[in-house]
Amino acid sequence: MNLCGFEVGLDKPVFLIAGPCVIESREMAFETAGALKDICAEVGIPFIYKSSYDKANRSSGKSYRGMGMEKGLDILADVKKQLGVPVLTDVHSIEEIPAVAAVVDVLQTPAFLCRQTDFIHAVASCGRPVNIKKGQFLAPGDMKNVVDKAREANGGADNIMVCERGASFGYNNLVSDMRSLAIMRETGCPVVFDATHSVQLPGGQGTASGGQREFVPVLARAAVAVGVAGLFMETHPNPAQALSDGPNAWPLPRMKALLSTLKAIDELVKSRGLLETEA
């Protein structure tokens, strides 16, 4: 699959989707996008910048949601033009899709909406690549049904990715079953692993989600060792001050060290081949 000018797949270098959970300001958007661009160029990892103009599924109605679609898309458009990086953002309703698709390079669907048939049809038919997040409530094998819906809408175009972000495990907890990455390959789509939302503790702080940031490298290393096309990681210059998902965001100053390790694992695994394909 060609994505934003580079090839993705199990026989291609791992790529990265990264940025702050939500757009907090124009200055921070440019700071993080510029830093990530430089880091990924140095490490040798293709990069797509991610940030959201609206977080429609916050734990509390009083939590910061974002700058709104108009201001947020203006910032993403400027990041794309001035820094020369592809951009991704998520959409939460059918009505938003045309305006978002006119600006960004890749659209993303929230995990909670992965079974909404009309929504999946609309996103998939917009003409842009789509990263479909697997719901925390969904078995990995059931993503085939989601992908089938998307392909019905886009005429079978090769522009759909599927993303694992953990599975609900009791209350306020998620776990990552690494078998799901192999199972989701059966959709025929590139598989992306979300290493930061997978350590989230949904609603774990009462009016906000908690997280176990210390396990981001653990799960990221494991996923790359399994074999994935891409990684998704939310990052922030100072996660303690982040306006959304700070507890599970990976610190921007520590991103280079983590990506260097993941790059080495990815090269080793993909150079040896995947034995499970012969089992």
UniProtKB/Swiss-Prot annotation:
Keywords: Cytoplasm, Lipopolysaccharide biosynthesis, Transferase. InterPro entries: Aldolase_TIM, DAHP1/KDSA, KDO8P_synthase. It is an enzyme of class 2 (transferase). It holds the Pfam family DAHP_synth_1. Pathway: Carbohydrate biosynthesis; 3-deoxy-D-manno-octulosonate biosynthesis; 3-deoxy-D-manno-octulosonate from D-ribulose 5-phosphate: step 2/3; Bacterial outer membrane biogenesis; lipopolysaccharide biosynthesis. Belongs to the KdsA family. This is 2-dehydro-3-deoxyphosphooctonate aldolase. The gene is kdsA.
